[in-house]
Structures are given as structure tokens and as C-alpha cells.
Amino acid sequence: MNLPVATALFTPSWHAELELAYARFGDCTRPTRRRHLGPLRVQKHLYAEGPEVCQHIIVHPPGGIAGGDRLDISARVAQGAWAQITSPGAAKWYRAAGPAYQSLNLHVADGATLEWLPQETIVYSAAQAELTTSIELEGDARLFYWDVVALGRPASGERFDLGHFQAHLDIRRDGRLLWHERQRIVGADGLLDSPIGLDGHPVFATLLVTGEIDAELLERCRSLGHEVRGDLTQLPGLLVARCLASEALLARAWLIDLWRLLRPALLGREALPPRIWNT
């Protein structure tokens, strides 16, 4: 039974923190810090691609984020190290009488690589989700970052009619701003159906990867994704890809297809999808 928002939430809020750090020792990347507070954890680090790439899976045992919750996540990748961070499933932001927050701070040192590849974020109608992401790159640090956001639950016939989704994202290299983005989508906003907004698509995705590709590879990337509305833009030192989709699975499949093409070209390694994506 669906209860009114004002009476639905009597559960206590969570304040969770996760602090990660990675360093290179010889030809191996190892985690050097895994501090957690509250219900945020990482599973045992994996080396599916060999010792150079350290993979971590972030888990949030409560299964979702409700009003008053606050998640603070930070990761630092030291010189020469390579970290790949993903998640086992969707992050769910539940309907709430008040806002919930996530702060993400990533720092990638000169010569280091970070792949931030979480699964989708589902924002239920009447949720109040506020996310802030700050990424600092040094020298020739490399970044592969994506996010997928689903508003409402279209498979269940739930539109995003109440609440809001707010996201701030800044990327800097040596203190210089590379990317600055502010999003705020309010339930039942006209932009949800407007041709200059989401045009009726409940799902949108963004990919940001450092580096530049040639025109031939750019066209190959643009030829992907017949089930989504997607495109790419090459900026100086940063490739941007965006799509609109009817389902999160379609958007995520498009991102993975791009990753398969772009990872060898920009990071010098073939793309090996984490096994957790198949579970």
C-alpha cells in the first residue's frame, strides 16, 4: 500500500562515509585506505585484468537512500595507480519528506587512472535527491566517468510527478575547470516532456572521458545506440557523451558499448566488463 509521504517515513536517517585510496607498488595497484562509517562498504578488491588494475565494488547494505540520509564518498588514486570502481546494482532514492544527500570527491594524481562506472541511479517519485560531485585531476591523470539516472519507475507506470533531483558536477585539472554542470529537475516539470528537455524519456546518461579521439572513431561511436537517442562531443581534452532512453538497461548498454570502443583508444587496455554487471 502506498502511504502519504508525510506518514511513510519514520525510519532513522543514515550518515555513511567511505574513504578509499590506491597506490602503485611495482606493477600492482593496491588499496592503501578503506575507511568506512555507517552502511557503506567495499567488497574485497579484485584483479580480473591482472595486478595493474584494482577493482572495487561499493555496496550500500540498506539498499536505498531515504530522507535525511547522507552519503560521503571519497577516493584518491596515487601516481601510476589504476582503480576501477563500480556497484552491484542500482542506487535507489526513495520518496521522502525531506532531502537526502550524496557527496562524491575523487582525486586522481599525475599518471594515475580512475574508472568510475556505477550502475544506474533510480529516483522514485517524491524523492528529494541532491548529489554533489567534485573531481580533481593532476598532470596527465586519466578519467573515465559515467552516470545513468532514471526518474520514476516507468516499468511500473510511475512517473516522476513529485520531489526533485539535483546534481552538481565539477571536473578540474591542475585547478583549471574542465567541466561544470548543474542539474535540477522537479517532479511534473514541463522539461520532462519538452523537446528541449527529456522529451518524454525517463532515463538520461552522461559519459565523460579525458583525452581526444580521431574523427573515424568518433563516427564509430555515433553509430552505436539505435535504441537510445545519443551523441558525442569532442572538447579540448575531454570527450562528452549523452543519451536519452526509455529504460536504464538501454542507456547502460550504450555506455558499455562506448566503453568497449573508447577504453582501448584512450586508456590503452581492452574493455573487460566486471562480472558483477552480469548478476
Curated annotation (Swiss-Prot):
GO cellular component: cytoplasm
Subcellular location: Cytoplasm
Keywords for this protein: Chaperone, Cytoplasm, Nickel insertion
Record HAMAP family: UreD
Quaternary data: UreD, UreF and UreG form a complex that acts as a GTP-hydrolysis-dependent molecular chaperone, activating the urease apoprotein by helping to assemble the nickel containing metallocenter of UreC. The UreE protein probably delivers the nickel.
Family recorded in the similarity comment: Belongs to the UreD family.
Official protein name in the record: Urease accessory protein UreD
Organism: Pseudomonas fluorescens (strain Pf0-1)
Gene giving rise to this polypeptide: ureD
